[in-house]
């Protein structure tokens, strides 16, 4: 004990990062478990498919899918509208040295990713989906306004503004599509901007319709969120192990984690007096415990006090986190 007390907190964080995680089967096969006993039996996973909302006559997943499939998403492919006589002007600028990826190829890749990503965002949460729909719509509206204000030779379209990757998950952000070619500019005088504007206006109309149709799905009417509340309630009121009220929630997107934290923390505190924390790796974490540092190590220590040696790392602290929300 005296030796452990001499170590700085950084030592334990380092050990947590380099320690090899062994599976149950590995431990049962190579280690003597007579002292610790058998691992608890795992319950079968639950596969739930809640409705989008409990509102009558509201939009459903099929309606949203149909609208998404109607989107052209030409906001991500402006190079397709460069006039043939002007293509040579942009050839050297849009063909990235050292790769076979052209600007047109990159744009088409991002367009396809965004088409798939809209479905991913919807699967994650209606909140994340709404954010992405509104961001794309704002981007399209701004581009249409640029075209409307266009005067011959006086306007340049900066493609940096339409290659934002904040709506994509971590795996998609690591593709070459987001690592090369973010500096290309196209003069609107070199584009068939009339055709492009026509396609943009179609998408803007459909996105506005989508935004209006999901606007009424507040947390109170978000069936997926309410289903999560029911699962948490059952876990706390009928724990598998006596006194075990721990809940770990993973999501692919940090803004879904924010949405869950805002609602789950309030629900857990008001109904059961439990503390909640959020760790996404993007920004400093959050916790309902006043004055507690919300860094990863402190949050994990308060969430799993026995395994993390909380009595040594945070002596005298009685604070404990029961619900932890994080990104994959």
Regions found by a protein language model. Give the residues of each.
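Conserved interdomain hinge at the start of the Helicase C-terminal
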Residues: 219-252
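Conserved RecA-like P-loop NTPase helicase motor core
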Residues: 220, 265-328
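Short, solvent-exposed loop/turn segments at secondary-structure junctions
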Residues: 20, 253-256, 282-285
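Inter-lobe coupling linker of SF2 helicases/translocases
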Residues: 1-162
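Conserved strand-helix element at the start of the C-terminal RecA-like helicase core
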Residues: 118, 125, 129, 243-261
